[in-house]
């Protein structure tokens, strides 16, 4: 007997006990309607106004929000971020990484140069970062050019990591195809014994990047979906072009505006 039903829409309204049933439906080609899955954010009295900016330097504003995220007990890794890269012909990719430092010069992270993101940054050295702190209903988006960190800085950070993490970086030629997980286990054990009493050399294919911010957007959620968005961008260094009536001077070469949600 052949069933003529090709697809069905399922509205997700019930709690987690329905997970198994929903998974069953999904495997049968059902279309999962997740529209009702929404939560309340902040109210209008908690809106993020321009007067609430800690600083007109977006790096200082980021530091303020980042500190609140670090202090929030419901946020496990405040430095977790999505890093989006793109090939020269416009094919994007994204993944979660940990931010390992930030300052006036930009945002630092470390990875394998032979990974997909490493190859994309080589051919198209621009990236976007997104930090999402859900318990605070806040998000920060950063855009800008990326360059490799000096080898000495990468070396110093590499050897500050736990030895098991150093060995893991040597074990994994990130994004290469491997036969199975046992392959990693065996190689990890072999290298663990090899470097038991000696320093782990940093692989040439491992290092760091720094993203120099040209755009930084601060987003705070509102229950009525009239979210707050204040975006900073680098202004013209010469100052030849006058600012529009809704564009404001920030610190140094930054200008800022409010965007519609």
Curated annotation (Swiss-Prot):
Keywords: Flavoprotein, FMN, Oxidoreductase, Phosphoprotein, Pyridoxal phosphate, Pyridoxine biosynthesis. Gene3D superfamilies: Electron Transport, Fmn-binding Protein, Chain A. InterPro entries: Pyridox_Oxase, Pyridox_Oxase_CS, Pyridox_Oxase_N, Pyridoxamine_oxidase_dimer_C, Split_barrel_FMN-bd. One of its GO terms (molecular function) is FMN binding. Pyridoxal 5'-phosphate binds at residues 42-45, 100, 157, 161, 165, 225-227. The keyword Flavoprotein applies. Catalyzes the oxidation of either pyridoxine 5'-phosphate (PNP) or pyridoxamine 5'-phosphate (PMP) into pyridoxal 5'-phosphate (PLP). Homodimer. This is Pyridoxine-5'-phosphate oxidase. It comes from Mus musculus (Mouse).
């Amino acid at each position: 007997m052949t069933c003529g039903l090709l697809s069905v829409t399922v509205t997700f309204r019930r709690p987690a006990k329905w997970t198994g049933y929903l998974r069953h439906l999904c495997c049968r080609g059902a279309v999962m309607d997740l529209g009702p899955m929404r939560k309340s954010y902040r109210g209008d009295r908690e809106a993020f106004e321009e007067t609430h900016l800690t600083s007109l330097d977006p790096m200082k504003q980021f530091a303020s929000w980042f500190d609140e995220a670090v202090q929030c007990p419901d946020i496990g890794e405040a430095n977790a971020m999505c890093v989006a890269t793109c090939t020269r012909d416009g094919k994007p990719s994204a993944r979660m990484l940990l931010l390992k430092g930030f300052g006036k010069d930009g945002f630092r992270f470390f990875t394998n140069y032979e990974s997909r993101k490493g190859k994309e940054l080589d051919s198209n050295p621009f990236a976007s970062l997104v930090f999402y702190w859900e318990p605070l209903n806040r998000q920060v988006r950063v855009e800008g050019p990326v360059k490799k960190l000096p080898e000495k800085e990468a070396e110093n950070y590499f050897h500050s990591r736990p030895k098991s993490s150093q060995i893991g970086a040597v074990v994994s030629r990130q994004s290469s195809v491997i036969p199975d997980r046992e392959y990693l286990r065996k190689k990890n054990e072999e290298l663990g014994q090899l470097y038991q009493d000696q320093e782990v050399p940093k692989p040439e294919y491992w290092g760091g990047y720094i993203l120099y911010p040209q755009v930084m957007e601060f987003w705070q959620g509102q229950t009525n979906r009239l979210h707050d968005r204040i975006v900073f961008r680098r202004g013209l260094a010469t100052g030849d072009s006058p600012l529009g009536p809704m564009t404001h001077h920030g610190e140094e070469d930054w200008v800022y505006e409010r965007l519609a949600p």
